[in-house]
């Protein structure tokens, strides 16, 4: 599976296309803004799906335009944010499910913390994992309550750390990175004592 990316929006957000090289079939992930750039990202492919890693506004700003242009199913986690936004999902993404894209597959990981409906998309048989705002090279995704921060810590321990060091993480903002490059920092972060009421921005 090939991963294409482009930055979109006034607060740069990474949109992605997952492309099956055997069939040319593609899926657009996180249509945050700038439909013309998103169409360029899909050039030469046959889009078959729109996928959301989560439903924060910076990741779905061009969703309605792209739905109107592409006429393909919308996949997302059926969490509270999707319900609050009244998104009409065509299919739900659940932990450990798989989704076919041409002859390729992605495995779904529920990775809550930054928000309840956050998922990550791992290419089966490959190294790429689209992590949304689960984590970045410099720290975990921002959290909005102490409970969310504790959820983020649990996600790092139970979901992210079991991934191999070779996992190539593609985040919602900023550069991609190998998990092995940041694993020692994550482990140190998890080993530290954090105030019970802490939440917000954090660095490893």
Give the residues covered by each predicted segment.
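Core dinuclear metal-dependent hydrolase active-site scaffold
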Residues: 3-6, 17, 98-123
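Active-site HxH/HxHxD metal-binding segment of metal-dependent hydrolases
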Residues: 12, 23-26, 33-107, 184-192
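Metallo-beta-lactamase
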Residues: 115-204
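Conserved beta-strand hairpin/beta-sheet module of binuclear metal-dependent hydrolase folds
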Residues: 1-45, 120-132
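Hydrophobic residues in well-ordered beta-strands that form the structural core
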Residues: 29, 75-76, 131, 171
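Conserved catalytic scaffold of divalent metal-dependent phosphoesterases
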Residues: 20, 79, 96-99, 104, ...
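Short, flexible loop segments at the rims of nucleotide/cofactor-binding pockets, characterized by
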Residues: 3-8, 26-29, 50-53, 107-110, ...
